[in-house]
Amino acid sequence: MARSVWKGPFVDGYLLKKAEKVREGGRAEVIKIWSRRSTILPQFVGLTFGVYNGSKHIPVSVNEDMVGHKFGEFSPTRTYYGHGADKKAKRK
């Protein structure tokens, strides 16, 4: 189920402060965040966030198409190695 419209998007408070500080400074740096559950807001466009995936920070450059999505969608937590080879074909 989607979040109620009257509640508005969820964003951790520290995330807004960090983004504002980088905007004021005018320097392009990666903002390290652990809040995968936060929604990407329009004021984050153009910034680069390091989203934690459980082992390291994955750099995510925010563009207009990402607004409204969650940060966690762009930082996968699992590595896919593919399905195992066919054991019957291997024996022959």
Swiss-Prot record:
It comes from the Bacteria. The keyword rRNA-binding applies. Keywords: Ribonucleoprotein, Ribosomal protein, RNA-binding, rRNA-binding. GO terms for cellular component: cytoplasm; small ribosomal subunit. One of its GO terms (biological process) is ribosomal small subunit assembly. GO terms for molecular function: rRNA binding; structural constituent of ribosome. It holds the Pfam family Ribosomal_S19. HAMAP family: Ribosomal_uS19. Protein S19 forms a complex with S13 that binds strongly to the 16S ribosomal RNA. Belongs to the universal ribosomal protein uS19 family. PANTHER family: RIBOSOMAL PROTEIN S19P FAMILY MEMBER, SMALL RIBOSOMAL SUBUNIT PROTEIN US19M. This is Small ribosomal subunit protein uS19. It comes from Rhizobium leguminosarum bv. trifolii (strain WSM2304). The lineage of its organism: Bacteria, Pseudomonadati, Pseudomonadota, Alphaproteobacteria, Hyphomicrobiales.
